[in-house]
Regions:
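N-terminal accessory/pre-domain segments preceding catalytic cores
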Residues: 2-200, 287-290, 324-331
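Glycine-rich, acidic and aromatic/proline-enriched surface loops and short helix-turn segments
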Residues: 204-221, 307
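Hydrophobic/aromatic-rich core segments of domains that either
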Residues: 247-331
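Active-site nucleophilic cysteine motif
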Residues: 204-208, 241-256
């Protein structure tokens, strides 16, 4: 079986300081209380009835109310010039914001963290955009580049940051260019609908995973020639019911983050195909990496694309011990 889910084009722009080309998916899209129950009067005669015991033993439901964190560019800590701003007021929450107001039609932002992994994004102007600090605590270099000719770029603005993230899960709960949602997003409403009545985060993950794999079909035409710098419009994907690997992962990640479940959108290679999948965190299990199914004890690698398009036997053979997946970046 040959699996080629996301044939992806790549930019050939030359950034200074040996910066890599833009990520294949680097261009941005435009854009807990427990529920109260009714008071119940139970007489002493009813207290030991089977119905009462069943109620007493029932597992409490989790709160399905969405929580959509909102990135902010407060201006309290910035690097700026006359055409660009890097706002790191909330770097302790695991993100920075950037805005470009100049006239250059092609602008990129590059983030290099303490693990030396380089993330390159397209930066559009017209307002602040949010970028995760995915590499944890440490020193980050954040640089904005303007195209000067052909594929050549020059530094426009930079900031060197010493980042200490207060909550390690924050980068994977806030929206960003790759996982782009708000409280008004349709994916958030659908996530709440799917989470209603669930008793645990694992049940929510299962319900959302099942919904995505059963209701979104793979778009082979789009995968064969994806737009340069593609990122997902998650509501459009939900409405159309079709998408490529990044779309599956972005929709599921948006739903789960809005349900307070830390979720990493991960990009790398599945054998020789450039691919996207997700990993999730629960308090009971820690990070669930490489999840396809739950056997009662173990989850591994959440890959909603393969889950939707591959039979169980083939899927399990491909996943194996996870060695077919090579993680490069996470958002």
């Amino acid at each position: 079986m040959t699996i080629g889910l996301c044939a992806c084009g790549s930019d050939s722009d030359n950034l200074p300081v040996d910066a890599p080309v833009a990520d294949t998916y680097g261009e941005p899209s435009q854009s807990s209380a427990v529920p109260s129950s009714a008071d119940t009067n139970i007489s002493s005669a009813d207290a030991s009835s089977p119905e009462t015991e069943a109620v007493a033993d029932a597992e409490p439901l989790r709160d399905a109310t969405p929580v959509c964190l909102v990135p902010r560019a407060d201006g309290t800590a910035t690097a700026s010039n006359d055409v660009a701003v890097i706002d790191y007021s909330h770097m302790s929450d695991g993100y920075v914001c950037a805005n470009y107001t100049g006239t250059c039609p092609k602008v990129k932002l590059r983030i290099t963290g303490p693990d030396t992994v380089v993330y390159t994004y397209n930066l559009h102007g017209g307002g602040y955009e949010t970028f995760p600090l995915s590499s944890g605590d440490g020193y980050y270099d954040v640089t904005i580049y303007e195209n000067i000719s052909g594929t050549n770029y020059a530094t426009c603005l930079y900031a060197d940051l010493d980042v200490q993230i207060t909550d390690a899960f924050s980068p994977f709960l806030y929206p960003n260019q790759y996982v782009n949602f708000t409280a008004d997003s349709k994916v958030v409403a659908k996530g709440q609908e799917l989470a209603e009545g669930a008793s645990s985060d694992l049940e929510v993950i299962t319900r959302i995973y099942d919904y995505i794999t059963q209701n979104i079909t793979y778009d082979y035409g789009k995968a064969s020639d994806p737009p340069t710098g593609y990122t997902s419009d998650v509501d459009a994907i939900l409405a159309s019911g079709t998408g490529i690997c990044l779309d599956y992962a972005a929709v599921m990640a948006s739903m789960l983050r809005s349900q307070r479940i830390p979720t990493r959108l991960e990009v790398g290679y599945a054998q020789d195909a450039y691919h996207a999948w997700i990993s999730v965190y629960t308090a009971d299990t820690g990070w669930l990496n490489g999840i396809i199914e739950f056997d009662g004890n173990v989850w591994t690698l959440v890959d909603p694309t393969f889950g939707a398009n591959t039979d169980d036997k083939t899927l399990k053979k491909f996943i194996g011990d996870g060695s077919n997946y090579i993680l490069q970046k996470m958002y």
